[in-house]
Design a protein with these regions (language model features):
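Rossmann-fold NAD(P)-binding glycine/threonine-rich loop
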Residues: 82-92, 99-120
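Structured catalytic core of nucleotide-sugar glycosyltransferases
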Residues: 71, 97-100
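N-terminal glycine-/serine-/threonine-rich beta1-alpha1-beta2 phosphate-ribose binding loop
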Residues: 1-91
Length: 120
């Protein structure tokens, strides 16, 4: 089972959540037959009314230190703390998916693809 985390739960983050939930069968076929499961959603806000409120954490280290999490979607936007979090995740051997062009251009522009696992 591929376990993923989402960092940020605004418009884009909630969209990523919906896509994973709605298309889990298609994603499983793309992930070498492994089912794709959301383990964490990182956000500073409370989501007490969310049907899966147990997924939410305010602690980045929950994601960083969990060896089961292999892929993280960075959808926080901006440069900080997205850069620090992404750098730590990459150093820990996790793959990071982001659409954050500022993060890519300013912080990881010279990072070799074979080393970074930073997907845009």
């Amino acid at each position: 089972m591929a376990k993923v985390a989402i960092m940020g739960y605004g418009t884009v983050g909630s969209g990523v959540y919906d896509i994973i939930k709605t298309n889990s069968d298609k994603l499983s076929r793309s992930a070498n037959g492994e089912s794709v499961h959301i383990k964490y959603i990182l956000d500073i806000r409370d989501f007490d009314d969310h049907p899966e409120k147990e997924l939410f954490t305010k602690e980045f280290n929950d994601i960083l230190n969990d060896d089961e999490v292999s892929v993280v979607a960075e959808v926080m936007g901006g440069l900080h703390p997205a850069y620090e979090f992404t750098k730590s995740l990459l150093e820990a051997g996790k793959s990071v998916v982001t659409s954050n062009k500022e993060l890519r251009d300013r912080a990881f522009g010279d990072c070799p693809r074979e080393k970074c696992k930073l997907l845009l």
